[in-house]
Amino acid sequence: MGSTAETESICGQPGVTRDALPVHRVYVDGFWMDATEVTNEQFEKFAKATGYVTIAERTPTQEEFPTAPPENLVAGSTVFTPAPEPVPLDNFYRWWRYERGANWRHPEGPSSDLKGREKYPVVHVAYDDAMAYAKWAGKRLPTEAEFEFAARGGKSGLIYSWGNELHPAGRFMANTYQGNFPVKDDGADGFGGISPVAQFAPNSYGLYDLAGNVWEWCDDWYRPDYYEQLARTNSPARNPPGPETSFDPVEPNEKKRVHRGGSFLCTDQYCTRYMVGTRGKGEVTTGSNHLGFRCVKPGTGAKATANISHSTASVPNP
């Protein structure tokens, strides 16, 4: 895990999406963060030890979805499906489908499995699934402020977690979508889809994949106006836990929490949320094949040396 000392930090991103404004300052106590997203290998150990069954593996009930036809009450999850030809980008249902039998053990559906994917990030995890793993591991999910602080790596004013150029000196720094979205990812960055963890350079804290690959759950409820609330105070908010309730005006009846980091499906053609200060959101019972998580735990006294082994790293003081 990476350790951070308590410090003041910038959150938000100008010139992208309204919910990332205004840019504001927060104060975050020191904490430890997993160096990578939780992998299939790690999640499998948890599932075997506890017998835990994820939401995507459970058959929905009529009580949960009283208006749904019985034939639609089938376990599964949401899977990205490339469009056969260029399509307007105003309706994501053109490239997403509900796949029966898709879950973390079968990322693309019943015919897929985890063979050779042990080091890939676990996906198709809903918020409660991620929380269950974190509790078992003696950790928790990061707050949105903690995630952005860690992603910035002790640096302020950057567009990306690594700097201000998307491809410095022509180098790919994260797993994002290359090619014509949503038709074909040409894999110019080395991966035509999801990748194993830690395939790109870590940030200055020794943390991997805080941009791209898979979105990551944060503990905060989502509200598009939350940053406005924080900015009204005259001093930096200390360890902001997020708003007390969820509200998304686009889907006001759904309870959503924050996603961060973007994914292998993010592209400048459609979604640029691999930028370090941008925000995502997701309904709490829903997973997909581009959504995972990592964990944190309290910690102080970071030292200025790197100590990376397995899924841990020591992060220098800012």
What are these regions (language model features)?
Residues 35-47, 126-132, 148:
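Short, solvent-exposed alpha-helical surface patches in non-cytosolic proteins
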Residues 2-10, 15-16, 53, 59-276, ...:
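Functional-site microenvironments in short loops/helix caps that host divalent-cation chemistry
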Residues 288-303:
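Short, structured beta-strand segments at or near domain termini in extracellular proteins/domains
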Residues 38, 221-222, 300-301:
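Acidic glycine-/aspartate-rich tracts in secreted/extracellular proteins
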Residues 25-27, 32, 196-198:
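Generic structural detector for well-ordered beta-strands
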Residues 37-53, 105, 219:
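K/E-rich alpha-helical interaction surfaces of small helical-bundle regulatory domains
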Residues 31, 46-55, 137, 302:
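Short capping motifs at secondary-structure boundaries
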